[in-house]
């Protein structure tokens, strides 16, 4: 069924910045998508088109991207009478219309909004849920797999104030029978953590960062990890809930010195304490020995390939590429060849279409990698990634703490999907890393 109407507008994300919303109308109704945006963005990501007009929204407006949908994409798509059920052909048309490698002509935020809306319309036309439509597009095996929620309960780095360099400390409730039990345990730990943070660091420590995690004035990773393990113990889930880290280390990498500064938010940081890639790897290895860490994302800067490969060869946990791979097939291929990671962080707005996201996931699965579907720090009420995680059989999702509506929207959607699927789905649990093969 072709598109009858396509219209974009700007709305606001969870950080109060403008983002693109797209409405796509067919005979079956109106289908809507909202595009997220990131705070720590990889230099190799598809281009998020911002207006750069300092007089409006501090230069972060998206009026140009909206205009590109309404004046360029919409008439072309309607004219071409594209079938919304054929996602690959639809997305190919969008890519050819843009014609650049990084989607800089029309903007990845314009293209993605249309791509997601088309996927929703395709599902609507088939009369199936979005996750089922995606599973069909991706040729995912049955049964469906509900993902382990990687809950970002403590924020540092670019997502919070304080001096903590590492960006995210997550809990992963793996040792449970269902997604709903897993999420319940995670929320109980989160509430214990808030109580402990307030007790230890004062009332303001209960305030939350961009992704809903607490952001106490913590200096070191050990301090953060001790607080989290104490919360897990207090909630009664020792051994059942694991820990994951997203270092987002490109944020504290000093290119000139080729070293990592774990005190990068301090203007008087002691340069003698800056670490080489190997020294940082040794530090991480000590943390992995001491705490129940099962996954480590972006341990090194996005182009420090040697440090990544060295770390993967010396550890047996999941090493996730985000800034390293930016959901980009070329960089994923290189990372697979150089054994620089063993899991992909899948962010649809890093690559810009549903089809390319599916391809990135399938390329990763073919290499026996894990795939973790992810939100961005600037999120909205759009729940597409919940359906994507189930449709791709990813087995793991990170979409913030169990706090703030834009984060909970995704977890709540997963609860609905779990209820709807019943015994047609299983929970990934401790097999989250290779859930495609469960």
Curated annotation (Swiss-Prot):
Mg(2+) binds at residues 246, 297, 322. The keyword Glycoprotein does not apply. Pathway: Carbohydrate degradation; glycolysis; pyruvate from D-glyceraldehyde 3-phosphate: step 4/5. Keywords: Cytoplasm, Glycolysis, Lyase, Magnesium, Metal-binding. SUPFAM superfamilies: Enolase C-terminal domain-like, Enolase N-terminal domain-like. The keyword Cell cycle does not apply. It is found in: Cytoplasm. Its EC number is 4.2.1.11. GO terms for biological process: glycolytic process. Mg(2+) is required for catalysis and for stabilizing the dimer. Homodimer. This is Enolase. It comes from Yarrowia lipolytica (strain CLIB 122 / E 150) (Yeast). The gene is ENO.
């Amino acid at each position: 069924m072709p598109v009858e109407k396509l219209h974009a507008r700007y709305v606001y994300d969870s950080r109060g910045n403008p983002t693109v919303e797209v409405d796509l109308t067919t005979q079956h109704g109106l289908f809507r998508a909202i595009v997220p945006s990131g705070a720590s963005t990889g230099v190799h990501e598809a281009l998020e088109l911002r207006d750069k007009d300092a007089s409006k929204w501090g230069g972060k407006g998206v009026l140009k991207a909206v205009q590109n949908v309404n004046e360029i994409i919409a008439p072309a798509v309607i004219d071409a009478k594209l079938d919304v059920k054929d996602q690959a052909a639809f997305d190919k048309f969008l890519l050819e219309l843009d014609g650049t490698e990084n989607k800089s002509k029309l903007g990845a935020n314009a293209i993605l909004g249309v791509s997601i809306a088309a996927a929703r319309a395709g599902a609507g036309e088939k009369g199936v849920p979005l996750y089922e439509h995606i599973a069909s597009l991706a040729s995912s095996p049955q049964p469906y797999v509900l993902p382990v929620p990687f809950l970002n309960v403590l924020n540092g780095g670019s997502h919070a104030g304080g001096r903590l360099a590492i960006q995210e400390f997550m809990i992963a409730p793996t040792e449970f029978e269902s997604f709903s039990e897993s999420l319940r345990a995670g929320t109980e730990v989160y509430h214990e953590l808030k109580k402990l943070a307030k007790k230890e660091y004062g009332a303001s420590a209960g305030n939350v960062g961009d992704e809903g995690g607490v952001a106490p004035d913590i200096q070191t990773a050990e301090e953060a990890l001790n607080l989290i393990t104490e919360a897990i113990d207090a909630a009664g889930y020792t051994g059942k809930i694991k820990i994951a880290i997203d270092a987002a280390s490109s944020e504290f990498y000093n290119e000139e010195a080729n070293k990592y500064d774990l005190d990068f938010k301090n203007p008087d940081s002691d340069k003698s304490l800056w670490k080489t890639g190997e020294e940082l790897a040794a530090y991480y290895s000590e943390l992995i020995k001491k705490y129940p860490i099962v996954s480590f994302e972006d341990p090194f800067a996005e182009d420090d390939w040697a440090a990544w490969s060295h770390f993967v060869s010396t550890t047996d946990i999941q090493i996730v590429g985000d800034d390293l791979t930016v959901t980009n097939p070329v960089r994923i291929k290189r990372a697979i060849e150089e054994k620089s990671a063993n899991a992909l962080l899948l962010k649809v707005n890093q690559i810009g279409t549903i089809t390319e996201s599916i391809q990135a996931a399938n390329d990763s699965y073919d290499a026996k990698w894990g795939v973790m579907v992810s939100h961005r720090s600037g999120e909205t009420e759009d729940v597409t990634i919940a359906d994507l995680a189930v449709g791709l059989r990813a087995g793991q999702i990170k979409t913030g703490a169990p706090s703030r509506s834009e984060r909970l929207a995704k977890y709540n959607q997963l609860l609905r999907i779990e209820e709807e699927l019943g015994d047609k789905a299983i929970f990934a649990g401790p097999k989250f890393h290779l859930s495609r093969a469960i």
